A protein has these predicted regions:
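An intracellular "coupling" helix at the cytosolic face of ABC transporter transmembrane type-1 domains
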Residues: 18-25, 120-121, 137-146, 150, ...
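Transmembrane helices of ABC transporter permease
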Residues: 23, 27-37, 78-81, 148-202, ...
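Transmembrane helix-loop-helix hairpins at lipid-water interfaces of multipass membrane proteins
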Residues: 28-88, 168-173, 284-288, 411
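Hydrophobic alpha-helical segments in the permease module
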Residues: 74-89, 182-186, 255-276, 288-310
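ABC ATPase nucleotide-binding domain helical subdomain, centered on the C-loop/LSGGQ "ABC signature"
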Residues: 109, 327, 405-407, 411, ...
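Cytosolic ends of transmembrane helices, especially the final helix of ABC transmembrane type-1 domains
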Residues: 229, 253, 297-328
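ABC-family ATPase nucleotide-binding domain "signature/switch" substructure
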Residues: 390, 427, 432, 443, ...
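Helix-to-loop junction immediately C-terminal to a conserved catalytic motif
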Residues: 396
Length: 564
């Protein structure tokens, strides 16, 4: 019996698997039916083999099933059954491959979308490498079990039951003797499953740490080079791989030993069946054809037992994978209802704000009040750790206040607490490089998917990014991960142009000009202020900055102090 972990009960795990099954039930049904039809063909082949041998040896037997009366007819029947077996195997593999990819993609999309739409708690609980490992490896494990392993197991059970009754109809004593290993199999399975599940979880956790180390090291390889710490990371990776190797070795030893014990039992049962058949043949109680059928049916009974021993590790791995995926789904989703748009401008009012990232962290804000009127231009100053970026995240509804309110308001309209539904009014330029790998055009379309080239070039001009016109491929210039191929200043200006394409009445810029020289910064700020003053509805601008050039263009300055 498979038991739940300390975190999830068996019922919770089975309920989760049922939800996954409902998404891929067509493929599971097709695979199960394909397996059951194969079982029928296998037994038909056994019956046809017995028939051919009986005809060849001149033995006649009565049967209620219509059958050929000549050896030629029996041969044609055998060839026909084999042809059906080959065709079914070919078609089954083709369908399983195509539908398997679709099921895997659907599972990954579900996890991917949940992660992107879930609430952000301010601190990532898991390394991105671990998350990717779960999305790719664990989702594949779960899909394979639901769409392939379980349907195969169903077909195996059908094969086992049919083989037992087929053999029982020929020789009851032999059928009972061959299946006597079943109680031992069940007992060993219970002991095996509990231990194997714990080992599998340790292996998956170590595998995630290996992937996290690889990803982070590749991402920061320039830093590792300049700090001359490449040997240290290679040693760290080797240590993790050694741990993984030890865990896999132990898992393999444990699994192989368990299988060896079962195979000894299977071998003994097969030997019993062979000797029993030889003895019965010597006594003249059975024919050569019946002996051949006995041996084949014993294989049809023992084969399922062997296959079930192979299915158990896969099912155990799937339960471990399910737990890891369920952990990713624990974070609640944001409220993604109908967007709340402010068509005539909006401001932000913050009242009695108290916020800390968790119960053990210092309070970033304590009973704080701020007001950013509609159409105003505000600079937010303060030392590192004073809460400037945190304030922006609260306005974006990425974080929730512990106490107090953060509201969006406009004259003539009721104030609304900020949420994912009010995010449509906000345009955000984060600090650092925020470009995606791909073309410049695609990055700009992230701000406005249907933007025309004219609109793109206007936004680029306002952001002082006219250098795009001089690039050989223009808007179709490809950049690498993290904006590779552009300087920090160029990447920052592309990010600002992308933000300008997005329609919103509140613009949030978090150190958006930090990588620009003074002359370019002044030109960009001048373009930005003049452009927004010409709009029918003057937007609200909020700058987080350390630069005095930005402060000179603002009507309001807020200085944050770091709380002790």
């Amino acid at each position: 019996m498979i038991v739940g972990s300390e975190k999830y009960t068996t019922r919770q795990l089975l309920a989760w698997f049922w939800r996954i099954f409902r998404r891929v039930k067509l493929q599971s049904f097709i695979n199960a039916m394909s397996g059951i039809v194969r079982v029928g063909l296998d037994f038909a082949f056994i019956w046809a083999t017995k028939l051919a041998i009986d005809l060849a040896t001149g033995v006649s037997s009565s049967s209620f099933i219509p059958r050929p009366s000549t050896l030629f007819g029996a041969g044609v029947l055998l060839i026909s059954i084999m042809a059906f077996q080959l065709a079914l195997g070919y078609l089954g593999r083709w369908i399983a491959a195509l539908m398997g990819v679709e099921a895997q993609n659907r599972m990954q999309r579900h996890i991917f979308e949940h992660l992107l739409r879930s609430e952000w708690r301010g601190k990532e609980q898991r390394h991105s490498g671990d998350v990717l490992n779960r999305m790719v490896s664990d989702s594949q494990t779960v899909v394979n079990v639901v769409t392939d392993t379980i349907p195969q197991a169903l077909a195996v059970l059908v094969r086992l039951v049919c083989a037992f009754f087929f053999l029982f109809s020929m020789d009851a004593m032999l059928a009972v003797g061959v299946t006597a290993i079943l109680p031992v199999f069940i007992l060993l399975s219970r002991l095996y499953i509990n231990r194997m599940r714990a080992i599998t979880r340790e292996v998956r956790q170590t595998d995630s740490r290996v992937q996290a180390t690889l990803q982070e090291s590749i991402q920061h390889r320039l830093i590792l080079k300049t700090l001359e710490r490449v040997p240290l990371l290679v040693q760290t990776l080797s240590s993790l791989q050694a741990t993984l190797r030890h865990q896999v070795r132990y898992r393999t030893l444990f699994s192989s030993t368990s299988n060896l014990i079962l195979n000894i039992g299977f071998g003994g049962a097969y030997l019993f069946a062979f000797l029993w058949s030889v003895n019965r043949l010597a006594d003249g109680a059975i024919t050569f054809g019946m002996m051949t059928a006995f041996i084949q049916l014993c294989g049809q009974i023992q084969g399922p037992f062997r296959e079930l021993t192979h299915f158990i590790p896969a099912i155990i791995s799937s339960f471990t994978a399910a737990e890891r995926l369920m952990e990713l789904e624990e974070t609640p989703l944001e409220d993604d209802g109908e967007p709340i748009r402010f068509c005539h401008g909006a401001g932000i009012r913050i009242t009695n704000l108290t916020f800390a990232y968790d119960a053990h962290s210092r309070q970033i804000f304590r009973h704080a009040d701020f007001d950013f009127p509609s159409g105003s231009t505000t600079a937010i100053l303060g030392e590192t750790g004073a809460g400037k970026t945190t304030l922006i995240r609260l306005i974006l509804a990425l974080l929730k206040p512990n106490e107090g309110t953060v509201e969006m308001y406009s004259e003539g309209e009721a104030a609304v607490p900020v949420s994912a539904r009010t995010r449509c009014n906000l345009v955000y330029v984060p600090q650092g490089n925020s470009l995606f790998s791909g073309t410049l055009r695609w990055n700009l379309q992230m701000g406005k998917p249907d933007a025309t080239e004219t609109e793109m070039f206007e936004a680029l001009h306002l952001a002082c990014a006219d250098f795009v016109n001089t690039l050989p491929d223009g808007l179709d210039t490809r950049i690498g991960e993290g904006g590779a191929g552009l300087s920090e200043g160029q990447a920052q200006r592309i990010a600002i142009a992308r933000a300008l394409l997005r329609q919103g009445c509140i613009l949030l810029l978090d150190e958006a000009t930090s990588a620009l020289d003074q002359q370019t910064e002044q030109a960009l700020l001048k373009n930005l202020i003049e452009h927004h003053q010409q709009l029918p509805v003057k937007p609200t601008l909020i700058f987080i900055t350390h630069r005095t050039a930005v402060v000179e263009h603002c009507s309001q300055v807020i200085t944050l102090e770091k709380k002790k």
